[in-house]
Structures are given as structure tokens and as C-alpha cells.
Design a protein with these regions (language model features):
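Membrane-interface helix-boundary motifs at transmembrane edges
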Residues: 75-85, 158-169, 212-224, 276-286
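Residue-level signature of transmembrane alpha-helical entry/exit and packing/kink sites
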Residues: 56, 81, 89-90, 142, ...
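Kinked, hydrophobic transmembrane alpha-helices enriched for aromatic residues
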Residues: 21-48, 58-61, 65, 88-109, ...
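Hydrophobic alpha-helical segments with transmembrane-like composition
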Residues: 54-55, 62-63, 69-71, 101, ...
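Central hydrophobic cores of alpha-helical transmembrane segments
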Residues: 169-180, 225-234, 291
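Alpha-helical transmembrane segments and terminal signal-anchor/GPI-anchor hydrophobic tails
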Residues: 11-12, 219-285, 300, 316-318
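C-terminal "closing" transmembrane helix and its immediate cytosolic amphipathic cap
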Residues: 2-13, 278-288, 301-361
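Juxtamembrane loop-transmembrane helix junctions in multi-pass integral membrane proteins
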Residues: 19-25, 43-53, 82, 191, ...
Length: 361
């Protein structure tokens, strides 16, 4: 996930399935599923129903995993230390990938349909988006909003933890977020760096961290496990269908905003269940370790490939193009990630963001 490396990667009294072979294979799998969902959700040609389901959970999942990755000691660290560590881990990549996106935009903004899309916009407008950190104004690469958004979320959680323990913090934040969703009008005036949606996102962050420190894990097997899975799947599908297309980045919480949190929670539970059932693999590990590279670069890679295809006369995109473009974005990140980690690891916020257990080196 897009988060600082752990200070102590040992889980606190973990259930046995969560850690295998010296790595958190459970986390690797969940991060891998999450980043693949992000790419699939942004590639053209995706069926509308699939996009609706992906958007119902993919960004809340990332906030949840970021909270899970926060070690208990760092949750209690002084605010200054949290500010410096989180700034290095998130804002340095934000600056770097914004610069990469700006160069790509300047090189391609006058090509094809992009000429009309970006008519009247210049570098000053792009820099304005960088300052606000809002997806709608980061037109050169809208996904970059997540970097400042997670930065604010982590700082907000750090402040709350000065007052409450993990369980009480989760309860207080959940009540406040649900009250906001239930009793406030639709978001019209956006605040920079996701300061408005941070109150919603931090609930998932707090839930992830509470799950880690509590070591809670339901013990189901056989028919009970399958029945629980079917109930959660049915609830998720029903809630997502009721909600329609949501988008946390744009403060769009669906047709019934109060259902945004439970719908995302059901989706997260399904991903976690799937993650625990997957065997460890080098592919999942690679996707997990390089999610920080895939996340900001996949829109540029997809745009480059789709633009090239259109210049060759490719027609409207369907499911096959959707799959191929998604696969291209993931495969193209293999050499890019290697180059970045080999030569300029500093731009990723740390020499290595993989979950390496203490003493393994």
C-alpha cells in the first residue's frame, strides 16, 4: 500500500494465517488485489457495473491497509515525528510523480482529442491543481490526489490518537463520519488536500489500525464460512447497486450517503477474505511492493497506449481492450519500478517499501 515502511513489521498477536514465510502474505495479497482493481477501474472499456463495484471499495481499501500497516509504536509517536516521516513517505513521491505527469501532459496535450480537452489550460493551471491536491483540479493525473489525501488522513488520525486509544478512536470517528454523511448536504465546496473527505477516509484508516492492534479474527470454517461469505457478497452487491457510482476522490458518496461506509466495509471484508485464501506468490509480492509505482503511473501508460491505438484507427473500446490496456499498464511498470528503485529510490520516499521483517537483511 501507499504508506511509510513499518518501524516494526511484526504483528501484534496475529492470527496464524496472516504471516507466512517471514512476510505478511495476507497484506501482499490484499495490496495486489487493490492495485489491480485500481488499474481495472481506470482503463477504458470497463463494463459500467464492474466500475461501480470497483469504485465502491477500492480507495477505502487503500486507506484501510494503510492503517493496518501503521505500527503501534508509530501510532503513538510525537506529532512532529509523524509529520516528518509521513511527509517523506507521501509528499516526496507526490512531487516526483506530479513532475513526471506534468512532463507527459506538456508533451501530449495537443495530440488528438486531448487538444480540445485541455484547451485553455496551461502550466499555471496544472500547478494550481498541485497546490490544491484535488482530483478534479489535478487534470494532468487525477489519481495523484491520494498522496496528499492520505497525508492529511494520517495526521488527522495521529491527532485523534493523542486523545483516544485505537478502539475508542475508531468508534468516535465512525460516529462522526456517519453523522456527516447523514445530516450534511452534498459536498459542493471542496477543501484542499482532501481536508473535507479526510473525515470519511480516516474511518477506514482507523479500522485497519484497530484490526491490527486488536488481533481480532473471526473463526469460521466449513458451511458457516461459506454462508458468511454469501451474506457479505449479497450485502455488498445490494448496497453497491443502491448507491450507484461513488467516488471518494470527488466526495461523491452515492445515492444514499449513509450507506457509503457499510458498502465499502462489505467490499473490504471480501477482499480480505480473498487475500487470506490466496497462496503466497512472487507476482502478488511484486504487485504489493510496487503499488507505489503502479498507482501514479498507470493512467499515463494507459493513455499512451490508448492514444497510440486510436491513431492507428482503433474503434470504441470493449472488454478485450479493457483487459489488454490494464495488463499493459501493469507489465510496463516492471522495468520502470526496477529503474526507480535501482537508481532513484529516494523519490519513492524510502530505499525500499517492501515489508521486510526485522533482522531479515
Amino acid at each position: 500500500m501507499l504508506s511509510p515502511p513499518l518501524e516494526d513489521t511484526r504483528l501484534v498477536a496475529p492470527p496464524a494465517p496472516l504471516e507466512r514465510s517471514g512476510r505478511f502474505d495476507f497484506i501482499d495479497a490484499a495490496k495486489a488485489i487493490g492495485i489491480v482493481l485500481v488499474v481495472l477501474g481506470h482503463a477504458p472499456g470497463a463494463p459500467n457495473g464492474v466500475v461501480t463495484l470497483i469504485y465502491s471499495l477500492h480507495m477505502p481499501l487503500f486507506f484501510f491497509l494503510s492503517g493496518y500497516l501503521l505500527s503501534p509504536s508509530r501510532a503513538q509517536a510525537p506529532l512532529r515525528a509523524t509529520l516528518l516521516r509521513t511527509g517523506r513517505a507521501l509528499l516526496v513521491p507526490y512531487v516526483f510523480f506530479f513532475a513526471v505527469s506534468l512532463v507527459y501532459w506538456l508533451a501530449t496535450r495537443d495530440l488528438g482529442a486531448r487538444a480540445a480537452k485541455f484547451a485553455g489550460l496551461d502550466t499555471a493551471d496544472a500547478l494550481h491543481g498541485f497546490v490544491t491536491g484535488l482530483s478534479a483540479e489535478l487534470f494532468i493525473n487525477p489519481v495523484l490526489w491520494f498522496f496528499p489525501g492520505l497525508f492529511v488522513c494520517q495526521l488527522l488520525y495521529a491527532v485523534v490518537r493523542r486523545v483516544f486509544d485505537a478502539r475508542t478512536a475508531l468508534a468516535a470517528l465512525a460516529v462522526f463520519a456517519l453523522a456527516l454523511l447523514a445530516f450534511t448536504p452534498p459536498w459542493t465546496l471542496r477543501w484542499p488536500w482532501g481536508l473535507d473527505i479526510a473525515w470519511i477516509a480516516v474511518v477506514f484508516f482507523a479500522a485497519g489500525h484497530w484490526w491490527r492492534v486488536s488481533a481480532w479474527s473471526p473463526r469460521l470454517s466449513g458451511p458457516a464460512e461459506w454462508l458468511a461469505a454469501l451474506v457479505v457478497i449479497a450485502a455488498w452487491l445490494a448496497l453497491a447497486g443502491t448507491q450507484g457510482r461513488v467516488d471518494l476522490a470527488h466526495a461523491n458518496f452515492g445515492n444514499v450517503p449513509l450507506l457509503f461506509v457499510p458498502c465499502a466495509a462489505a467490499g473490504i471484508v471480501l477482499v480480505l477474505g480473498a487475500a487470506q485464501s490466496l497462496p503466497a506468490s512472487s507476482a502478488l509480492r511484486w504487485l504489493s511492493d510496487n503499488s507505489l509505482v503502479i498507482f501514479p503511473l498507470h493512467p499515463l501508460l494507459i493513455n499512451a497506449a490508448s492514444g497510440a491505438a486510436k491513431s492507428l484507427g482503433a474503434g470504441p473500446y470493449g472488454p478485450l481492450a479493457w483487459v489488454l490496456l490494464s495488463a499493459w499498464a501493469l507489465v510496463a511498470c516492471v522495468p520502470i519500478a526496477w529503474l526507480l528503485r535501482r537508481f532513484v529510490p529516494e523519490v519513492l520516499g524510502a530505499p525500499r517499501l517492501a515489508l521486510t521483517p526485522r533482522g531479515a537483511a
